[in-house]
Amino acid sequence: MNIYFINPPFKAEYGKFSRESRSPAITKSGALYYPLWLIYAALYSSKQGHNVSFLDAPAKQLNEERSLNIIRKTDNEHSLFVLDTSTPSIKSDVAFAGKLKALYPHSFVVLV
């Protein structure tokens, strides 16, 4: 199975959004916590024999359009997308998931 793990974009124009911090927010200092739970899941899936892709959009301050372009450019036809979410960004995360589903209608999109 081809699985794409995504830390989705959120207000990239304002700075880096840290979902993993104690209080998820756009950081004033620019500090950014790694999306550890998403990385753990990606590593476990890889060890189980799945083809894994990973995108950390907030780390690169990617907006939705640039993130979707990167996803489209991968060679694999992904059957599962796993998106990291948080309460402050949930509306944006759901909208991004909807765009993924529109681009890949036969794939599953999971928000965690």
Labelled PLM ranges:
Residues 1-112:
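A short, structured N-terminal alpha-helical element that caps or precedes a catalytic domain
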